[in-house]
Design a protein with these regions (language model features):
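Bacterial Sec-dependent N-terminal signal peptides
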Residues: 1-13
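First exposed extracellular module after export/assembly in secreted or surface-exposed proteins
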Residues: 12-138
């Protein structure tokens, strides 16, 4: 038997964060934007138990109004070659219903925010953090 070294760290890494567009109609469930990034994990332990109270993907707003939480899709069965790690493209759709203009201080018709994005694996390892370009709400 020989030991096979994982291609990636057991702490997840995310890279190449992109937005499909930068303007979103606030409170509109039909308008959406796509946030994409690559995720890498050396021990392939992505995907927390949905009953644990934890999530996989965290997107925290710069305005601290609302933080968004998501799960990775469930993968049934073993992942071939998972001992060497796992990598993949992650796509998350955000609707205008999820991001609203902050009018708590004074009424306004537009707003700007950033999202801080990171993932957490089953072992609780937090990935590096990436920030989106500005998202303009109208």
């Amino acid at each position: 038997y020989s030991c096979k070294k994982a291609l990636y760290s057991t702490i997840p890494t995310i890279e190449q964060l992109k937005l499909s567009k930068q303007t979103l109609k606030s409170n509109d469930p039909k308008d959406s934007l796509l946030i994409s990034f690559y995720v890498y994990d050396g021990d392939a332990d992505l995907g927390v138990d949905r009953n644990s109270g934890s999530y996989d993907i965290y997107m925290d707003e710069s305005r601290t109004i609302q933080n968004l939480r998501f799960y990775f899709p469930e993968i049934n069965g073993a992942i071939p070659g998972a001992g060497k790690g796992i990598e993949g493209l992650c796509n998350v759709y955000i609707t205008g219903k999820q991001l609203k203009i902050d009018s708590t201080v004074f009424p306004k018709s537009a707003d700007t925010l950033y999202l801080k994005v990171y993932v957490v694996d089953k072992a609780g390892h937090k990935s590096n953090t990436l920030f989106t370009n500005p998202i303009y709400l109208k």
